Curated annotation (Swiss-Prot):
First-listed, main subcellular location of the protein, grouped into a coarse class: cytoplasm
N6-(pyridoxal phosphate)lysine: modified positions: 252
Subcellular location: Cytoplasm
Protein name in the entry: Ornithine aminotransferase 1
This protein's record includes keyword Translocase: no
Cofactor requirement: pyridoxal 5'-phosphate
Species classification: Bacteria, Bacillati, Bacillota, Bacilli, Bacillales
One GO process term, biological-process aspect: L-proline biosynthetic process
InterPro entries reported in the protein's UniProt record: AcOrn/SuccOrn_fam (IPR004636), Aminotrans_3 (IPR005814), Aminotrans_3_PPA_site (IPR049704), Class-III_PLP-dep_AT (IPR050103), Orn_aminotrans (IPR010164), Ornith_aminotrans_bact (IPR034757), PyrdxlP-dep_Trfase (IPR015424), PyrdxlP-dep_Trfase_major (IPR015421)
Keyword Cell membrane on entry: no
Catalytic activity: a 2-oxocarboxylate + L-ornithine = L-glutamate 5-semialdehyde + an L-alpha-amino acid
Length: 394
């Protein structure tokens, strides 16, 4: 294990500080390291593996398509793209979809769409369009996505970033109201903040944002890359407040844990600002990606993983709420997406949980984030709870 870590560290760029653990195999909700030790995966690649590791249905779809046709680029039609587009548009109740690859790429595309809509439809002077984001957000680390962040540590050394962005406190509707100007084209938010620490907004907040957008002719963009596709016990986390955004951004679990697939979805009145040449993606919507993503969506539906997430997530949250320890500040969550916020450094607790076979990670120093594959079973949930009880008892 040490030699693998040393080799990787020697050649890798220094933009990650991974746990000193080498994973070699994954199946369902479990992974194994090079020593053969088994872990319940409560990271899931940050919600990439919602369908579980190496799901046989998705693997089968991948291998069959890979042996037939992998890529032709979007200068031609493929025989599976339209069917996938129909499936995902019906799921999101949107007219159009832009297929892409990584999550941050989809955020970049959404920014472009919002800006062009702002100038072409709302009539804002080109170059004056504004987008409002939330403090403690995480939309990615490419230049446009980074411009939406309020974290100076992420942005330092990368200026100048995009102009025309503002951030306000997540959950503060008065602050958001004050930030809106005639040049505001879009408000972008994660319905539940993931990297920010599983932050759930006050009840009614998302509805109030929707009302503001309607009042001021502003696009509401929901970044559901991490929280969508069943993670919170709903197909989309926006459903917790019965709010429909103007733009959905999806990713991570859209590729079934096997391939990078993302998407931007909107209705005709928004998506029509894109015309040939205004945007493109060489790998976006390639036949292999589409075969995998189609299977990934089918698995979520056919195995009722969204409902499973809500049911088992509720069970896990109730069990964790029984934990009593002076270090625990708050435990919160929706579905199988749970944050345990401490009033001290979470890293030592994470280390002890990993020793007990629970693979997890801290975020923002004091928060333990849990996001196991949605295929996890009740026995594995009980093992997670037992490990937490043991760690906090000792």
């Amino acid at each position: 294990m040490n030699s693998i870590i040393e080799l990787t560290d020697y050649y890798s760029s220094n933009n990650y500080a991974p746990l000193k653990l080498v994973i070699t195999e994954g199946k369902g909700g479990k992974v194994w390291d090079t020593d053969g030790k088994q872990y319940i995966d409560c990271i899931s690649g940050f919600s990439v593996a919602n369908q579980g590791h190496c799901h046989p249905t998705i693997v089968k779809a991948m291998t069959e398509q890979a042996s037939k046709l992998s890529i032709i680029s979007r200068v031609l039609y493929s025989d599976n793209l339209g069917k996938w587009e129909e499936k995902i548009c019906h799921l999101a109740k949107k007219d159009k979809v832009l297929p892409l690859n990584s999550g941050t790429e989809a955020v970049e595309a959404a920014i472009k769409i919002a800006r062009k809509w702002g100038s072409d439809v709302k009539g804002i002077t080109d170059g004056q369009v504004e987008i409002i984001a939330m403090n403690n957000n995480f939309h990615g680390r490419t230049l446009g996505s980074l411009s939406l962040s309020n974290h100076d540590a992420y942005k330092s050394g990368f200026h100048p970033l995009l102009q025309g962005t503002k951030t306000v406190d997540f959950g503060d509707i008065e602050q958001l109201t004050q930030a809106i100007s005639p040049n505001t084209a879009a408000i972008i938010l994660e319905p539940i903040q993931g990297e920010g620490g599983v932050n759930i907004p006050p009840k009614g907040y998302i509805q109030a944002v929707r009302q503001l957008c309607d009042k001021h002719q502003i696009l509401l963009i929901a970044d559901e890359i991490q929280v969508g596709l069943g993670r919170t016990g709903k197909w989309f986390a926006m459903e917790w407040e019965q709010v429909v955004p103007d733009i959905y951004i999806l990713g991570k679990a859209l590729g079934g844990g096997l391939y990078p697939v993302s998407a931007v979805l909107a209705n005709n009145d928004v998506m029509r600002v894109l015309t040939p040449g205004t945007h493109g993606s060489t790998f976006g919507g390639n036949p292999l990606a589409i075969a995998i993503s189609t299977a990934a969506l089918d698995v979520l539906k056919d195995e009722q993983l969204v409902e499973r997430s809500e049911r088992l997530g509720s069970f896990l949250l109730k069990a964790l709420l029984q934990l009593k320890h002076p270090s625990i500040k708050e435990i919160r969550g929706r579905g199988l997406f749970i944050g345990i916020e401490l009033n001290t450094d979470a890293a030592p607790f994470v280390e002890q949980l990993i020793k007990r076979g629970i693979l997890c990670k801290d975020t923002h120093r004091t928060i333990i984030r849990l996001s196991p594959p949605l295929v996890i079973d009740k026995e594995e949930i009980n093992q997670i709870v037992a490990a937490f009880q043991d760690v906090f008892k000792n």
